[in-house]
């Protein structure tokens, strides 16, 4: 017992024994279990007195952590916090810390100076007499819609015209409407005064205000000489296109047709494209990209664009950057009902469109003179039209936008946004003339807004009034000579007027500017074409740049109305097309077809009409058309009844809505400029009828061939092709367009006509 006692005690013997004696060490070792038990008991005892052990603390920590996790899950699951609203407010309210603090402490503003400071503290503590309050006007930027803050760029010089605008809007013709758009591939954007609404723009259909019934009149060899509406389907709807077909509403034209008429017709192919919901439903997913590129131009034609050109072209939009300012969309009355407006808008932003429509309709009923309520209603109807793909609802939205702009005391920015959006939606429905009237009124209200004038020029082009458009762009360039958008459009008009050399600098400088709306395949197309015609070898540099920027499938294949993934090669064999029966029938009956063509040439009432698309450098070239855009010309077929009867058996050609069937006669001394057709959706057959022994040839891409009587040549006219007729007598061929063999039956039914 002594060793244990010594070990427990504090004497020196214990110390020496444990350190120096082996016995002590053994003794100490034998006594350790008891010591450990006592220590353990002592530890438990101390733990009860002193608090939780380490393991108990960790257990409670984990319980609390898990409780927090499950609480967070419950908050998200039961939607206790509206995170979308939080994020929206975080984005919209860009106030710095001092502004936030002033907002919080503003209620303690005792001296009426608009903020909380030392003087306010003195007043509250009774150290200073509180002054009489002065009437103050709350800052407009604190009272505007948070959901519309980023929609507007202030126009220079337009800050003091709100009162003036109402009087002018009241005098507007009630038949004019408009609305704001986002990126109409691209809505032509302007400089600082351009408003920037946050609403998306729908894909639209090519709709012109004119439609000429097909007779025996001139039929145009389709080229890219006209400014078309692109047939690209909206990404949001691309999956629906294959399954849905609706009738198109097109009040300004009897059928959706892409018209190739450089002299008269402009149709937009920007990312801003036009097609109403009914037409959009049976569109297909088109693209300007075709996968195969079998041919490239010669080495000398593949030189890259000069570095300075590449640099400018690769940085579009930087030049035109302007500082955005917050819009002034609430008048004094709307500020008093801002909470109600925000609550309704919250429903719209959360995708509860039907509820939002009802909420805004109730606000319009309660406050009929509120521009904000009316504008919100128009936006909801706009969204609902997109959701339901309804032209009828969209027409209601168009009317409501006009109502919002026409209300008393409507803020200037709201007027501009409402009318711009209405104009865009009118174009979407094909109401080109109504949209033009709206744009005219916008320019009348905002004469210093260059972007609106540029839009007005496009409006004139869309109805074929190139002369008026030219005047608009001349006015723009006189004020802003470096406006790239105005330059490319002015250059386009000059080229359409056959002022080839004069058009080149405008097209070139406009593209190089990098301004919004200038990076467009049509402008690369026309610039290269103009350069080719004046012998400028830089043409292929611009074609190459257009290809690099995704506008052309290749340097050779420069069509703009394309379906992605179709086999692409310049020359085809009958077996490759799958239309061997048609080819055999044409070749077996070539003399019958020839004789009816020759008989038509002898008639005096003009069945053959001159080509009028400015494709000829020189010479005489005429055509006699039997089918166009998949429609039979009954009057023309009276002049070639057997030929028409023969072709009725082959729907791949008679039903080709993107092609023609026609006789073509070319007289000696004719040269047709290099050109391309508008689409990759067709192939073109040439049946030789009367072919001189030498002097007639056709080049497609980099291969040149000649015709033979009674034989069919097949090529893809979306590739560059060129024709020479240097024989001593006329050349007569029969042209038969067929659908590209890889198009599906649905695509053949639904693709808009060209």
UniProtKB/Swiss-Prot annotation:
Entry similarity comment: Belongs to the aspartyl/asparaginyl beta-hydroxylase family.
Modified residues (Phosphoserine): 15
Signal peptide (from-to): none
Protein's name according to its UniProt entry: Aspartyl/asparaginyl beta-hydroxylase
Obligatory cofactor(s): Fe cation
Gene name linked to the record: ASPH
Record-linked InterPro entries: Asp-B-hydro/Triadin_dom, Asp/Arg/Pro-Hydrxlase, ASPH, IPNS-like_sf, TPR-like_helical_dom_sf, TPR_rpt
Sequence positions that bind 2-oxoglutarate: 621, 664, 684-686, 731
Source organism (scientific name): Bos taurus (Bovine)
């Amino acid at each position: 017992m002594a060793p244990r006692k010594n070990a427990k005690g504090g004497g020196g013997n214990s110390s020496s024994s444990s350190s120096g004696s082996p016995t002590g060490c053994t003794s100490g070792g034998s006594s350790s279990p008891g010591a450990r038990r006592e220590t353990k008991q002592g530890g438990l005892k101390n733990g009860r007195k002193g608090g939780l052990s380490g393991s108990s603390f960790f257990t409670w920590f984990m319980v609390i952590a898990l409780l927090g996790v499950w609480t967070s899950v419950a908050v998200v699951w039961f939607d206790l916090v509206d995170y979308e609203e939080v994020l929206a407010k975080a984005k919209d309210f860009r106030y710095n810390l001092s502004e936030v603090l002033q907002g919080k402490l503003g209620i303690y503003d005792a001296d009426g100076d608009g903020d909380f400071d030392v003087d306010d503290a003195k007043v509250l503590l009774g150290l200073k007499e509180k002054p009489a309050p002065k009437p103050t006007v709350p800052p407009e930027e604190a009272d505007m819609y948070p959901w519309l803050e980023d929609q507007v760029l202030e126009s220079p010089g337009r800050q003091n015209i709100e009162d003036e605008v109402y009087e002018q809007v009241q005098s507007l013709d009630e038949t004019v409407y408009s609305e704001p758009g986002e990126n109409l591939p691209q809505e032509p954007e302007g400089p600082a005064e351009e408003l920037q609404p946050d609403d998306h723009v729908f894909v639209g259909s090519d709709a012109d205000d004119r439609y000429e019934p097909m007779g025996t009149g001139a039929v145009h060899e389709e080229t890219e000489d006209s400014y078309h509406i692109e047939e690209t389907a909206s990404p949001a709807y691309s999956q629906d296109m294959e399954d849905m077909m609706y009738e198109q509403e097109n009040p300004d034209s009897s059928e959706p047709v892409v018209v190739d008429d450089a002299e008269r017709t402009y149709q937009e192919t920007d990312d801003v494209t036009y097609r109403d919901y009914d037409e959009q439903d049976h569109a297909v997913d088109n693209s300007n990209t075709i996968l195969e590129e079998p041919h490239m131009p010669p080495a000398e034609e593949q030189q890259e664009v000069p570095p300075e050109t590449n640099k400018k072209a690769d940085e579009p939009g930087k030049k035109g950057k302007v500082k955005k300012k917050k819009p002034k969309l609430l008048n004094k009355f709307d500020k008093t009902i801002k909470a109600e407006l925000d609550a309704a808008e919250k429903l719209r932003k959360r995708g509860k469109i039907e509820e939002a429509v009802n909420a805004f309709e109730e606000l319009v009923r309660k406050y009929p003179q509120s521009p904000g309520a009316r504008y919100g209603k128009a936006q909801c109807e706009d969204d609902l039209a997109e959701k339901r793909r309804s032209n009828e609802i969209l027409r209601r939205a168009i009317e409501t936008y006009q109502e919002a702009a026409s209300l008393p005391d409507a803020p200037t920015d709201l007027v501009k946004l409402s009318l711009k959006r209405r104009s865009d939606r009118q174009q979407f429905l094909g109401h080109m003339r109504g949209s033009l009237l709206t744009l005219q009124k916008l320019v009348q209200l905002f004469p210093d807004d260059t972007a609106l004038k540029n839009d007005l020029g496009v409006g004139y082009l869309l109805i074929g009034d190139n002369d008026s458009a030219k005047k608009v762009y001349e006015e723009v360039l006189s004020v802003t000579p470096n406006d790239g958008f105005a330059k490319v459009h002015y250059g386009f008009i000059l080229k359409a007027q056959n002022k080839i050399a004069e058009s080149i600098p405008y097209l070139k400088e406009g593209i190089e500017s990098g301004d919004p709306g200038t990076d467009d395949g049509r402008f690369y197309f026309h610039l290269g074409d103009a350069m080719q015609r004046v012998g400028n070898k830089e043409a292929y540099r611009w074609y190459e740049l257009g290809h690099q920027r995704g506008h052309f499938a290749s340097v050779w294949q420069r069509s703009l109305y394309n379906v992605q993934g179709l086999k692409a090669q310049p020359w085809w064999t009958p077996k490759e097309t799958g239309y061997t029966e048609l080819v055999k029938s044409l070749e077996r009956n070539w003399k019958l077809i020839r004789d009816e063509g020759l008989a038509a040439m002898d008639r005096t009432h003009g069945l053959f009409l001159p080509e009028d698309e400015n494709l000829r450098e020189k010479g005489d070239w005429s055509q006699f058309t039997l089918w166009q855009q998949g429609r039979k010309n009954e009057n023309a077929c009276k002049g070639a009844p057997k030929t028409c009867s023969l072709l009725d058996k082959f729907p791949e050609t008679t039903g080709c809505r993107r092609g023609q069937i026609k006789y073509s006669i070319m007289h000696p001394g004719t040269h047709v400029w290099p050109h391309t057709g508008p689409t990759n959706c067709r192939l073109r057959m040439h049946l030789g009828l009367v072919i001189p022994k030498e002097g007639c040839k056709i080049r497609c891409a980099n291969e040149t061939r000649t015709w033979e009587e009674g034989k069919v040549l097949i090529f893809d006219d979306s590739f560059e092709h060129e024709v020479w007729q240097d024989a001593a007598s006329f050349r007569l061929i029969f042209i038969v367009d067929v659908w590209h063999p890889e198009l599906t039956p649905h695509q053949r039914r639904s693709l808009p006509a060209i």
